[in-house]
Each structure stands twice: as C-alpha cells, then as structure tokens.
Amino acid sequence: MALTPMMKQYLEVKERNKDCILFFRLGDFYEMFFEDAETAARELELVLTGRDCGLENRAPMCGIPYHAANTYISRLITKGYKVAICEQLEDPSKAKGIVKRDVIKIYTPGTYSDASFLEETKNNYLMSLYLENELVCMAFADVSTGDFQCTYVKYNESSILDEISKFMPKEIVIIDSIDDTIIKAIKERFEVSFTVKNKDFFYLNASLNLKNQFPDFKEENYDDIVITGCNGLLNYIIETQKTTLIHINKLDYYETVDYLSIDINSRRNLELTETLRDKSKKGSLLWVLDKTTTAMGARLLRKWVEQPLIHKEIIENRQNAVEEILNNVPLLDDLRNNLKDVYDIERLAGKISSKTVNAKELLSLKNSIGNLPIIKKIIENYNTDLLKNIYSSLDCLEDLYSLLDNSILPSPALSIKEGGIIKDGYNKTIDELRMAKSHGTEWIASLEEQERNITGIKSLKVKYNKVFGYYIEITKSNLNQVPENRYIRKQTLANCERFITPELKEVEDKILGAQEKLMELEYNVFVEIRELIEKEIYRIKNTAKLISSIDVLQSLAIVALESNYSKPIIKLDGELLIKDGRHPVVEKMIPRDSFVSNDTILDNKDHQLLLITGPNMAGKSTYMRQVALITLMAQIGSFVPAKEAEIVICDKIFTRIGASDDLARGKSTFMVEMWEVANILNNATNKSLILLDEVGRGTSTYDGLSIAWAVIEYICKDNNLKSKTLFATHYHELTSLEGKIKGVKNYSIAVKKVDDDIIFLRKIIEGGADESYGIEVAKLAGIPSVVTNRAKEILNTLEENSPQNNDISKESSSSSNSHDKLESSVIKESESNIKTYDEISNLETNKIKEAQVEVAVEKEVTQDIKQIGFLDIEKEALIKEISSIDILNMTVKDCFDKLYDIINKAKSL
C-alpha cells in the first residue's frame, strides 16, 4: 500500500524537522501524526484518534484549532519541546493538486516570544557554547528584546556554570565536542534544553553573517573564537525564525574581569534574585531593590544585580545620579508617574522586527512615545553626568508618534486581517471602500422595508451568515404570502424558511466585495506602516535602553529614600568600614526598626580575617551575608543599608555556606565543602571577599579543626591571597589564633543568659564566645525538656572528665615554618586538577580518605594538632558533638535519634 499524497508531504516535512513536534496545517486545524500525535495527546491532554494514510494501519492523529495554537505551543515549550509550524503556502481553493506547505517558524524554549510564555521582568536567553583550543565562547541572545552578549574564558566547569548562573538561559546550542561531564553538570543545576550542532554549523559564513547582522561589526576587533561562537548562535536563530531579525543589531562583547565575579554557589547563598527555599523573588535582594515601573527597567535592574561593577568611575556616576534623584522628591514622583505609562518598548521592537506586532501593540507604542517628551523635560532638571547624558541622548521619536497617531484607530481590532485598524483620512481608497460598505448597510435596510411592503409580511427580516451570505427569513405562519416567482428557497428550518432574490444577491455582491477589498487593503496599509517603523528599530531600541536606565536609577533612589540608606564611599583599596550595617532583606521581613545593626571593619592587615563564634540561631550567617550584600549593592551603584560605609571594590565574592543542592545530588557533605573551599583558595585574590561558615564540620572533630586552622593560616599568610574574610566557626579553640596569626581578629554574637535560658542580642562584639549554648538553643527550638535536661547531665559529666589543656596557640606559632608546605598541600595547585564531584564519588573508600587529606591538610600537620594536649579524643569529640548540634535543621525524630546515639557513646567511654 502507498502513502496518500498528503501524508507523503507530511513525512517529507517531518524528515527535515526530526527534533520538533510538527504542527501540520489542514484547513482550520493544526494536525499531528504518528509519534508527534502520541506525544502531543499525552502532554496536552488531547483525544488521540486516527486517519487513513494509505498504509494498512491508520496513522495516530490529534489536532488543535489554529487560532488557539499559542496556548498549546506555550505548554509544549514549557515542557522543553520544540514546535515546528507547517503552514499552507497557497489558497487551497486555487491550488492545483495538493496544497503547498512548509515550515515557516520553529518555536523553541530559547526563541519563543509569545507574551503568555515570557516573564515580563526576566529576559528569555538562548545560549551557545563553542569550544576551541581549551577556550570556550559563551554567547547569549534574547530574541524578544534583541539583546546579544558574548565572552570567552578558559574551558572549565566552574567558569561555564558561573556564566550560566548570571543569564539563566532556557536553551543552549552546544558544539558536539563539549565533554559530557559539562552537559551533566549543567543539567543537574539548571532547567535547560540542549541542541547539539557540529563545527560546520558554527563556522558557516561566520564573518559574513555577523557583518550582515550587526552594522557596527568589524572583524578585526574580535578573536576568531568569538566570531565562530556568536555565529553558531546567530545561525540557530535564523534557522528557527526563518528570517533575519533586524532588532538584533548590536554585539556586546564583555570580559568577565570587568564585573564583580560571584560564583554559582555564592549567588545561591546570597539569594540575589531568588530565595534558596522556594526559588521566589520575594525574599531576595532583587525583591528589595525593585521599585521599577517598566518591564524593561525591571530586566535591566536584574542585570545590574547579576553583574556588579568594578570600575570606580562608573559606580560613582550611578551613585551621583541616584543621589540627585532622591534629593528632589516631587520631581521623583513626577518621573515615576510618567514612567508607569511607558509600555515594554524593548519587546515591542522585537515584535515589529519579527512581524508579529498587531495594531493594539502599535497603539501601545504610540502612547509610550507620547510620554517621552514629559520624561525628557523632567530629566532636564538634573545636572549629574549620567543624567545629563541620558537627557542629551534621549530621542523622543516624535515622527513615529505622528505616523501612528494619524494612521491607527484609537480602538483597533485585535486581528490585523479583518479590518477595523486604519483611521479615516489616512488612505483615500480605504475611505471610499468604507463609504461603499456603509451605503451597503443602508441598502439592506431599504431592501428589507421594500420587501415587507410588497409581501405584506411585517416580520420579514434580511439577515446574514458566512454560509449563505444575505438572505430573507420568513416565519412559517407567513409562508402563504411569499411571492412564487421572485423568491428562491435556500433553507427550511423548524420555525421559518430562508429565501434569496436576484436583487438581494446584487446588493450582496457590492457589499461583500467592498468588505473583502477593505480588509485586504487595511492589512496591506498596516504592513506598510509596520515597515516604516521597522526602519527606525535602532532608534527605538536606543530610546528603550535610556528609559530602562532612568527607571533603574529612580528605583534605587526610592528604595534608598524609603529604607534610610546611605551613600557609600567607594575606594580602590584600604579598609572596608560599615557603621550600623543592616541586612537589606531581613530588615524588610521583620517588624520595622527591630533589626539590630552592626559595625564591620575589614582590611588586609590587622582585621583581615574576622573569626566569628557564637551559638546557632544567633545571627552569624545573617551578619556575614549582610556584609557581602552591602558590598555588592555598593558596586552596582546603589545606596546601602548602613549609617555610613566605606566600600573597597572587590573583584570576587565567595561564600562557603551550606550544601543542600549538592547533597540532593548524592554528594557527601565533606566533599562538597572541601571542593568549594579548594575552589575559593585557588581563585581568590587580595581584592576578594570571602565568607566561610563552619569549615571542617563535615568530618571528625580533629580533622575538621585541623582543616579550619590550616585554611585560616593559608588565607592570612599567603602573600598572594590575604583576602578580606569572615570566618564563622564552632571550633572555639581557633580563637587562640588571634595575636598568633597576623590579621586574625576574634568576634562573637552577644548572648545574654537568664537562668537556664538565653537571649540572642544579635550584636557583633569583639572577643570570642565562651560556649556554644547548644542545649539552650535546643530548648528554644522546642525539644522536650526531658531531652534537654538529660543532655545537660551528659554534658556536665563529659566536661568534668575532659582535659583542660585545649590551647592551640603554641602550635600555631610552631607550624608557621611549615606554611610553605601547607601552601602546596591545603589545595590543589591549579583549578584544572581539582577533582570533580563525580570523580570523587567514584573513588574507593581508601581513595576518598586520601583525597580529603590532599584537599585539606597534610597528614603530619593533623598529627601535630593531635599532640596539642587533647588526651581523650573520644570524650572531647562527644562534647563538641553535643555543643554543636544544629537543632533548626533536625526533626523531632532526628533529635531523639541523636540523643540515643549520644547516650550510647557516653556509655561506651
């Protein structure tokens, strides 16, 4: 049996689009067949039927109405599928043989730009990864806005993951030579789909394509890897969109060293744009700072948060603009009120370029442009360099406003192919056709009255539908009065009959002819208007960029005003000083004015590493994150939550706090911790800010203490490091390092003990904490008193029998001679030699132990520490275990299990 011609055509098109679900246009429906039908029926909850296809078995089939396609496409794209739209390319009524069909567009997670799919305040990035000579080019494009950026770095997992975490692409076009371990690492951390292409796809017409796409592109300004990597992304956009998008007209190359570097773990721990717990914006730094009034402003603010600056002049220009805006509140209110009426010009430009814009959206563009002169007049009052530059560069697009105001109706139809979109007076022919259509309505009314008089039937009506056109409807009770010669019967219904007359058909031809011509002409005129606007895309995009910038600046100003922020002093080196600093997010989540502020001094000398001790729940982690967030806010140009602040520009921020995501992927707590610490020590500089929380807690007490000590020593003594560091720990023995290792300074969280209870004062004070208050914290967490009372008895017994000589200070001085050896053994010599999680997971047990020691500290140093004077290892370990119990992260059952374990250990001593 042979396939039917239509099914043969379907399979030919499908063969060219194997990785897509093919929407095949048949009349008023998109149909899917075979495996596509089975997939779509399952994912879209459609009824799966069948169709004769010329084979022995019917082809599985399901379909959707063409006018509802976007809803179904969005659902498939969200699930990671690609959808190819195969349209009829000719009028079926005029086709000779089978109707010509082909794919006119391919929708993918990284290229789909329907409003129902996109988030207004987020970019929808498509990414390419291109590998060449141990370098990797990463390019990012947002088809909906025209944003196109790229960079290249040394080929390693951490660098790739860090860049992806900034842009959060929905889809990655990847060269087939990329290692599978990189793809696996990306899939584990991000919800992203992949499209694999070969080297030829990236090379095809590279320089020519970029010259044609980007007007300012000059080949000599870019390395070959950038040209090839960007071309792969551009080729994919053209392949899926089936056209060149002229709003993608600027290639922005950036160096990663031009921005404050924040690795993927630090972004997560600092909750810059979403929370750790539920991935929501509320509770993040972005949530606090976002008072933007436009969608494009919100997207730009997100970029600023994701890519803080390191150049002092640019930071101060932003600061000065924010300061000037907030100093004139009435002007700020006017600015905000007018920005609220500005639509998403950036994405409108994308719709104009992709030829998907409708008349209502052009009306939104007109109304937005109408506010530009008022906004520019407001900006004229400002005198800072950045605001003056925005004022002088802002194009109010008056000519486009005039064009749209003269051409588009105030309330146009949604569809651009059904008329009702062009104003009277814009096109003479349209006016004439409208007159004919209007007279036709009068003719119909006149003819209806005429027929009533002739027949004497008062209920006679002239009606219209798409099947019969115009017809005369007469009720059955009046059928005996119908003229026999003139009335031609067309349809009999239960209560009436429908007729036509020669005169009625003549009027119909005139009316419908005018209507069809009018709809066709209005569509053609609309296309002409769209093309005129399309020629000005560059101007529109530039205006959108400037409006976005002023929106972000006013947002930072209103936040500073409402939250009592101060303007930080920006320095290239010296001390980082914060007076009465506050956590920007936490203070918004608790009652007003109840947050306890704290001071901070960090430098590369006496206050290089702040060793912070204190009980769980006291606020150590909040304080450390607070310092990092204040630094980051200052480097995006924002004011900061502090009475005063002097911020030294950081090149990198690192945090080692928690390992929940990696534990969920089956990685051991200790290995996650050591891998992250090694990454920090390998990549930090003397301009970096490091946050380390409970380093060493994932292994035995003495190994952990040894590692923590060695890490402190390495950070403070290595001449190439000396990073500003906040180091929170439960190892109280480490407080003896103050005065022994230059740069170490003890701080603790103030706690007030009342009887058997404790009160957290949330204040950072000089000096180390005297105890951990683990049992008291357990009581606060709701552990039954019988448990905490028994734990206290056990703790007292253990403390009575524990050795008293816990001072490690003398060891710290004797170990300084071995620092050179530590420098090479605490971490691996280069990032390329750091074992990945998966490699470590596959090691045998004895090799895991060797890897832990190799990453952390040499065995002989650990032995030295054990000789410090801890005579009874088991008892001391049990005391430490009890005092450092993290109740907040345990269930009630876990608490009882832990207590049972402690009792058994105590009995065995």
Swiss-Prot record:
A GO BP annotation: mismatch repair
Top-level taxon of origin: Bacteria
Source taxonomy: Bacteria, Bacillati, Bacillota, Clostridia, Eubacteriales
Keywords: ATP-binding, DNA damage, DNA repair, DNA-binding, Nucleotide-binding
Family to which this protein belongs: Belongs to the DNA mismatch repair MutS family.
Annotated Gene Ontology cellular component terms: cytosol
Biased composition (Basic and acidic residues): 818-827
One term of GO molecular function: damaged DNA binding
Span list, region Disordered: 798-827
Pfam families: MutS_I, MutS_II, MutS_III, MutS_IV, MutS_V
InterPro entries: DNA_mismatch_repair_MutS, DNA_mismatch_repair_MutS-lik_N, DNA_mismatch_repair_MutS/MSH, DNA_mismatch_repair_MutS_C, DNA_mismatch_repair_MutS_clamp, DNA_mismatch_repair_MutS_core, DNA_mismatch_repair_MutS_N, DNA_mismatch_repair_MutS_sf
Sites where the protein binds ATP: 614-621
Function: This protein is involved in the repair of mismatches in DNA. It is possible that it carries out the mismatch recognition step. This protein has a weak ATPase activity.
The protein, known as: DNA mismatch repair protein MutS
